């Protein structure tokens, strides 16, 4: 198992290239199961979750070829079977995304209940209910979802009680081969969903209401789609994290290959804290703040402040003057990084879903342990400003969603080593 050894308080300067968005790539990879045509996907990030999804598709019988480290050519023309087994699914919650496409195209599938970050309840019930609304019969037996629709899926209204990104994606993919019209009400509005819509539209699916909370899908009257090649959008969470590298170290950094509109909630908050930003069409440059003010954040669904940036801003709050308040409204149990930040000297108090951070605090290097994907990046951020040396353990969490984060910060001047645990 690897860990990162980080020397803190090293001056940083330079430019960072942002990778493709993991959270866009995963549903798009799953959606290739709907196609009987070869598809090329570009700008895939080299992260563990993407490799796991590629392996799952290969296990189902898809033909895969990596044309370069970030481009995958694949064909799901003839699959061996429609069973997503536990050993392939257990490490990644996004594997539930194969449910909709497998069911829609092959009328029956067996999908293991998924794994992934342990950050509270992420019920698959919403996915199952959506499939049932389209006419599927669902049984859960021995840890597997057994879904079948012998006569195929039929368009219907799907109302999500709670906004669900992966639930919306699964419903979209299933509806694309359902007979007639499906309406998804209370749909998630993330940019990653807009890109999935564009991908499905390239295969002939008619979708109205993209970027809104109500999607109207007219399914294609065929047994499969003819999906076209696609390039994955930049990762807005990696972009936000790299801006926080500049913010927490109070450095001048330029973040390239981004879509600034996708991270407006993040840039608005950085400006409020005191950072001058130069926002261009596909880059943002952050400059040192004269004074970093405390702030308040409440996580919300897109376009609100993303829950996936909450941990990074908690690390940043330790360097801001005054009392910052972070309220987490989307997941319970998502403050596990707080106790690890406290090991570095952070002054944080927790009350249910609200964290209060008093700053500014001088952090001191220590051994800390990553508990989930975004928490791991928060610990890296804190270690960059801590006095002395920190070691961040269990970075397999980090590798699930960040492509070579240590290489990217080292290119800015940081001193980060990836080492093996003894």
Swiss-Prot record:
UniProt-listed SUPFAM superfamilies: EPT/RTPC-like
User: Mainly localized where?
Assistant: cytoplasm
The active site of this protein is located at: 117
The protein's GO terms of the molecular function aspect are: UDP-N-acetylglucosamine 1-carboxyvinyltransferase activity
Q: Where does phosphoenolpyruvate bind?
A: 22-23
2-(S-cysteinyl)pyruvic acid O-phosphothioketal modification, residue list? 117
**NCBIfam families per the record?**
murA, PRK09369.1
The protein's name is UDP-N-acetylglucosamine 1-carboxyvinyltransferase
Organism, as annotated: Helicobacter pylori (strain J99 / ATCC 700824)
């Amino acid at each position: 198992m690897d860990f990162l050894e980080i020397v803190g308080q090293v001056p940083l300067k330079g430019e960072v290239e942002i990778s493709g968005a993991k959270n866009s790539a995963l549903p798009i990879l799953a959606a290739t199961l709907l196609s009987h045509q070869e598809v090329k996907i570009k700008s895939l990030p080299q992260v563990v979750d993407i490799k796991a999804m590629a392996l799952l598709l290969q296990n189902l019988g898809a033909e895969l070829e990596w044309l370069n480290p970030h481009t995958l050519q694949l064909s799901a023309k003839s699959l061996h079977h429609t069973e997503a087994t536990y050993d392939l699914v257990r490490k990644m919650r996004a594997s539930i995304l194969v449910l909709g496409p497998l069911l829609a195209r092959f009328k029956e599938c067996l999908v293991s209940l998924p794994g992934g970050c342990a950050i509270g309840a992420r019920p698959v019930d919403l996915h199952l209910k959506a499939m049932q609304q389209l006419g599927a019969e669902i049984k859960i037996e021995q840890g597997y979802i057994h879904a079948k629709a012998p006569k195929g899926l039929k368009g219907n209204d799907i109302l999500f009680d709670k906004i669900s990104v992966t639930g919306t994606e699964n419903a979209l993919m299933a509806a694309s081969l359902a007979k007639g019209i499906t309406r998804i009400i209370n749909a998630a509005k993330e940019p990653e969903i807009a890109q999935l819509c564009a991908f499905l539209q390239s295969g002939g699916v008619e979708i109205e209401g993209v970027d809104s909370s109500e999607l109207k899908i007219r399914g294609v009257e065929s047994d499969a789609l003819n999906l076209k090649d696609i390039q994955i959008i930049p990762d807005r969470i990696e972009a936000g994290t790299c801006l926080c590298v500049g913010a927490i170290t109070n450095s001048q950094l330029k973040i390239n290959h981004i879509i600034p509109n996708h991270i407006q909630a993040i840039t608005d908050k950085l400006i409020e804290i005191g950072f001058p930003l130069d926002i261009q069409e596909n880059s943002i440059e952050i400059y040192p703040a004269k004074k970093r003010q405390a702030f308040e954040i409440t996580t919300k669904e897109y376009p609100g402040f993303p829950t996936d940036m909450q941990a990074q801003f908690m690390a940043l709050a330790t360097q801001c003057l005054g009392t910052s308040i972070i309220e987490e409204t989307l997941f319970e149990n998502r403050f596990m990084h707080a106790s690890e930040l406290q090991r570095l000297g952070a002054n944080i108090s927790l009350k249910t879903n609200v964290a209060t951070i008093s700053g500014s605090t001088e952090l001191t290097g220590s051994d800390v342990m990553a508990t989930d994907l975004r928490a791991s990046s928060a610990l890296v951020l804190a270690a960059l400003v801590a006095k002395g040396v920190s070691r961040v353990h269990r970075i397999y969490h980090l590798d699930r969603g960040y492509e070579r984060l240590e290489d990217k910060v080292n290119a800015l001047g940081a001193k980060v080593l990836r080492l093996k645990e003894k």
